[in-house]
Amino acid sequence: MKGTPFRSPHLYQEGSSCMHRTIRSVAAVLTVVLSATIPMVPAWSDGEPRSIQFWWPDHLDLSPLRQHAAESDPLGANFNYIKAFQTLDLGAVKKDIAVLLKTPQDWWPADYGNYGPFFIRMAWHGAGTYRTYDGRGGASGAQQRFEPLNSWPDNANLDKARRLLWPIKKKYGEKLSWGDLMVLTGNVALETMGFKTYGFAGGRTDDWEPDLIYWGSGAKFMSNNRDKNGKLEKPLAATQMGLIYVNPEGPNGVPDPVAAARDIREAFGGMAMDDEETVALIAGGHTFGKAHGAASPSKCVGPAPAAAGIEEQGLGWKNKCGTGKGPDAITSGLEGAWSADPVNFTSQYLDNLFGFDWVLTKSPGGAVQWKPKDASADQLVPDAFDASKRHPPMMFTTDIALKTDPSYRKIALSFQKDPEKFKAAFARAWFKLVHRDMGPRSRYFGPEVPKEDLLWQDPLPAITYKAVDEADITDLKQKILASGLTVPELVRTAWGSAASFRGTDKRGGANGARIRLAPEKDWPVNDPQELKKVLDKLESIQTAFNDGNHDGKKISLADLIVLGGNVGVEEAAKKAGYPVTVPFAPGRVDAVQAQTDVKSFAVLEPTADGFRNYYASSNQLSPAEMLVTRASMLNLTVPEMTVLVGGMRVLDANEGHSQLGVLTDHPGVLSNDFFVNLLDMSTKWSKAADTAGVYEGHDRKTDALRWKGSTVDLIFGSNSELRAVAEVYASDDAKEKFVRDFVAAWNKVMTLDRFDLQRQ
């Protein structure tokens, strides 16, 4: 579950106050002429079902928890992509790609006889949707194949790039995912044009349905993604709807390099790129290829793939002007190349940027761009198809921004002065771009994986000791029980450690024990004062064990935190009359502060965690909506979310010891009391008079106050789908089932980042 859901051609607006699901036909939504902004308006066909949110927009949407079901995968539940990929002869694949790059096809000719620049753009735009605020987007899943990305204005004509690659995909089949193939092709393109890449890691599994991610509140492509204060709306990274980063003509099409620099810094920063990485990527990427604007997009270009006729077979942007391809190709409407050698890696982009004075002009397609003031540059660039023609180089407004912004200018000049520095910076920035969404290095596979640990990969130390055995685990459990730590303290700490995980980009989780490091140790949701108390006691247990004579066996604090949570759950289950053993697999390690980028980890901080009844007032979405968002990040299903909330409440595991939703007379006992008491019709619920978001449950006969609950608590009785699941767990015969299901869901969360176990 990588993103917000997409089921059928319906748009799910996560960012609206009620996460409205708006029903629209794909044809109406995605009929877009490249440079035009077509309103996205509702359109219905007879017989099309309306969603619940169509009739009741405030109704909680649970579809994020039903996304990417196993039933959608044609390869089957038993298929292991990693094992299949590891049987691949990567060298042979790269040779096949290299041949394809220089084998032009009549149906879509190659500029300068080389598809390399085209495929770099494909790989870049596939990976460039990643955004650090929520970890969504990126190359994994190959979402560029699906709506809406396959029909975004910024992805115009990349449908042809993927079709050109089909013979390679067809040849290697299930051994090579589209996600890996597109990134690998970008690497091979760079390498065949004289650039040494930093490396390549495989392991991206493909999705089989679109992610329906919140891309902005605008109802038109190219609409502004900024809020009323001019700030880029979080969690977005692109400045305008339908773009990967920024408008190359300038903000909202205005050719202002200074304003463009601000947009670039904000957009690239939202994808975890600093100024040096940003300049390296722009300068490196624009070393190659050309822009395409032979004529006006609005006059010549047809609908995007999602709105094209069925006979087009998934292709879009059909160009009716001239031959519609090659020298007549239209993509962005901008036209021209940045350098005189667009199919080889050089420093010409930087030389031209600083070597000429640039003036505004317009492309044949009517787009605003820049050309050298000096007429001597008019014959500098060869034509992509006709050797007898020459052209001046061109620049986008966003290129000129690198010259005008003081920080970007300083970096760009240093790259121009030192080409080796430029190469190294571009190699590392490109590697980060196309691997940023893959998570830690333990998820990297293949012979070209770099050996170096990079800070943005959230590195972990290697295990240098023997793992504890069952006897050791039993002994450690007894020591935890004797420590004086309570069930709620143990459960809260383990949950805080493990539930930092994001299924979107595979960051966070219990491995590394980063809950003891900045910034996690200071997050309000983790109750810093209590957390320190718990960690101090667990560390003393760890030290005593590791200093003892255990034949080289040691326990990490990361493992001990999870084991402590398990002990708490087991004790609570035993008190309920259902003794269980929570699964535990040692193997976690402890990161150090030097391996933990505070700024990078700050975006993982939960502003709401319904499982601990925590909600910060700064949130734009409701507590119930934020619960679903958090559950989707944890890859949970509706039943798993339900049983975990009910269990966490009776375990008294709320943040700050809040008693909201602790609907039991026996806190610390793993009973189904939360559901029994929530659904008890002898209790009447009403809004609390003094506190927004708090509800009071009074006895219907005596009016005595029984309970207090939050929106998150009451949603399990209010929402019809959640109530149906809650009724299962509230039933008299469900007490043991509740315990078993809670333990299974708990163990799932505790092991979300144990990629080693998942591969087994």
Curated annotation (Swiss-Prot):
Co-factor requirement: heme b
Domain of life, per lineage: Bacteria
Disulphide linkage map: none
Signal peptide location: 1-45
UniProt cross-references to HAMAP family, sorted A to Z: Catal_peroxid
Catalytic activity: H2O2 + AH2 = A + 2 H2O; 2 H2O2 = O2 + 2 H2O
Protein name, entry field: Catalase-peroxidase
InterPro entries assigned to the protein according to its UniProt record, in alphabetical order: Catalase_peroxidase, Haem_peroxidase, Haem_peroxidase_sf, Peroxidases_AS, Peroxidases_heam-ligand_BS
Active site positions: 125 (proton acceptor)
GO terms, molecular function: catalase activity; heme binding; metal ion binding
Pfam families: peroxidase
Membrane-spanning segments: none
Purpose: Bifunctional enzyme with both catalase and broad-spectrum peroxidase activity.
Cross-link Tryptophyl-tyrosyl-methioninium (Trp-Tyr) (with M-271): where in chain: 124-245
Lineage: Bacteria, Pseudomonadati, Pseudomonadota, Alphaproteobacteria, Acetobacterales
Top EC class of this enzyme: oxidoreductase
GO biological process: cellular response to hydrogen peroxide; hydrogen peroxide catabolic process
Family note: Belongs to the peroxidase family. Peroxidase/catalase subfamily.
Keyword vocabulary terms for this entry: Heme, Hydrogen peroxide, Iron, Metal-binding, Oxidoreductase, Peroxidase, Signal
